[in-house]
Amino acid sequence: FGFNIIDVRDVASLHRIALEHPDAIGQRLIAANGFIWFREIAALLTNAYPDRKVPLREMPNWLTRFVSVFIRELGTILKDLDVAAQLDNSPAKKLGWQPRTPREAILSGAKRLIDLGIV
């Protein structure tokens, strides 16, 4: 399982562009900058923070489907198992939006959580 990554600062930046840029009127701008699998996120965090315990195991899809019978909330992700959704953010980039890479967003978010003592 995975999802499209975006740094919250880039979401704010895109909101500002959407409010200020006349070419943004009437457009739907996607605030996402690349799909990444959870196992890739885990590997990235493990390399960046080797002293931290980062879960590396992934629940197999068959088990996720089985458990979703008992935990209905899991049902919402079943259609997305093994799907790498590619979203088109080119309209936003044409307006001058320059989001951070997924790697930068993940590492920055992790550092912030550590600095705040949350993890």
Give, region by region, the residue ranges found by the protein language model.
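Mid/C-terminal beta-alpha module of Rossmann-like enzyme folds, strongest
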Residues: 13-75, 102, 107-119
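Conserved C-terminal active-site "lid" loop/helix of NAD(P)H-dependent oxidoreductases
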Residues: 67-97
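Mobile gating loops/cap/lid regions near enzyme active sites that modulate substrate access
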Residues: 8-11
